[in-house]
């Protein structure tokens, strides 16, 4: 398929620069695949679409303040570092650095008042760096003190409250971008879902910076996906398999959950618990085995996430729904409105 088929024109003022004051006041477009029907609602009304036995699967990953600004220990030269993901070795991470010429193996950089030091171990084939951190106490607390949230490049305004770039159920630290479909949920909505007979189960997928990487190949099949770390607990796998066997819906909250569940699927449409790395690329023609419905935000033109939702609902339906969203002045991307895709 041609990349250009996933392009659309978005007025710049529809890119949400800030989260709404109230999470659940976001708008909710409800897209029904079978009837091609599109309804306009608000996220706080989501529980009215819940059927008895529905299982909502959420991603409990927490965004880390992964952006650090420091100085070269030997010369004082400035450096920006973005943490990508932890490696096998203790306190070792893969990171991006800017400017790259300052970060050669053996160089040491310091952040804060000697609170944190990073030694460059080597350079990866992709140009990122493998580093080892040295610090006192708890690494997460040091990061919270020194780091900044690496907001998406299309968000130009400063985030007043970093917690608004976290879901209310975020707990497993490791993402460098939020699983944004979950940003609309409040404890009250989760409670209302359960009151309607729905269940909620958790998994973890740490969102990488690759989620913002544009597709550059004219034919989408040639695109190489980035890998992201996931963990599907036994308890969640059990709940999913029970829902599938009962004939209830498994509703993925976000594309990160979709990718995880479709990675761990078995031939009979069930899932296996486990952890690992996924580079699954879902585009039209893909046959979904586990996910029956999904909640998601409005995605960038030509992005792999737009391809994923097009695979689920059909490209023509999604592209016409996006045009309707533009006409109705929906808010787009990370801090924008939501879409519920169901049969």
Curated annotation (Swiss-Prot):
This is S-adenosylmethionine:tRNA ribosyltransferase-isomerase. Its EC number is 2.4.99.17. Pathway: tRNA modification; tRNA-queuosine biosynthesis. The keyword Transcription does not apply. The gene is queA. GO terms for cellular component: cytoplasm. It catalyses: 7-aminomethyl-7-carbaguanosine(34) in tRNA + S-adenosyl-L-methionine = epoxyqueuosine(34) in tRNA + adenine + L-methionine + 2 H(+). Monomer. One of its GO terms (molecular function) is S-adenosylmethionine:tRNA ribosyltransferase-isomerase activity. GO terms for biological process: queuosine biosynthetic process; tRNA wobble guanine modification. The keyword Flavoprotein does not apply. Gene3D superfamilies: QueA-like. Pfam families: Queuosine_synth. Keywords: Cytoplasm, Queuosine biosynthesis, S-adenosyl-L-methionine, Transferase. Belongs to the QueA family. It is found in: Cytoplasm. PANTHER family: S-ADENOSYLMETHIONINE:TRNA RIBOSYLTRANSFERASE-ISOMERASE. Its main location: cytoplasm.
């Amino acid at each position: 398929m041609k990349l250009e088929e996933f392009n659309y024109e978005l007025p710049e003022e529809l890119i949400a620069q800030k989260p709404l004051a109230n999470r659940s006041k976001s708008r909710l477009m409800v897209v029904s695949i079978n009837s091609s029907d599109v309804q306009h609602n608000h996220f706080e009304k989501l529980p009215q679409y819940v059927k008895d036995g529905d299982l909502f699967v959420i991603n409990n990953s927490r965004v880390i303040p992964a952006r650090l600004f420091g100085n070269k220990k030997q010369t004082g030269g400035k450096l920006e570092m973005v943490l990508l993901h932890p490696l096998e070795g203790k306190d070792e991470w893969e990171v991006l650095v800017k400017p790259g010429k300052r970060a050669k193996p053996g160089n040491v950089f310091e952040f804060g008042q000697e609170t944190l030091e990073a030694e460059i171990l080597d350079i990866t084939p992709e140009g990122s760096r493998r580093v080892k951190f040295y610090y006192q106490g708890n690494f997460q607390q040091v990061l919270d003190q020194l780091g900044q949230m690496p907001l998406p490049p299309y968000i130009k305004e400063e985030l007043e409250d970093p917690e608004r770039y976290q879901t209310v159920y975020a707990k497993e630290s490791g993402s460098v971008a939020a699983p944004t479909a979950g940003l609309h949920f409040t404890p009250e909505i989760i409670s209302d879902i359960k009151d309607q007979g729905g269940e909620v189960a958790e998994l973890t997928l740490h969102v990488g910076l690759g989620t913002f990487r544009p597709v550059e190949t004219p034919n989408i099949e040639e695109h190489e996906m980035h890998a992201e770390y996931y963990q599907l607990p036994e308890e969640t796998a059990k709940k999913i398999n029970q829902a599938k066997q009962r004939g209830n819906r498994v509703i993925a909250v976000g594309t990160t959950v979709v990718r995880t569940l479709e990675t761990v699927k078995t031939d009979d449409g069930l899932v296996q618990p486990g952890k690992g790395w996924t580079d699954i690329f879902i585009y039209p023609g893909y046959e979904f085995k586990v996910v029956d419905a999904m909640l998601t935000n409005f995605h960038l033109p030509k992005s792999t996430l737009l391809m994923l939702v097009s695979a689920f609902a059909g490209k023509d339906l999604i592209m016409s729904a996006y045009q309707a969203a533009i006409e109705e002045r929906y808010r787009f991307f990370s801090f924008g409105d939501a879409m519920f895709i169901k049969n």
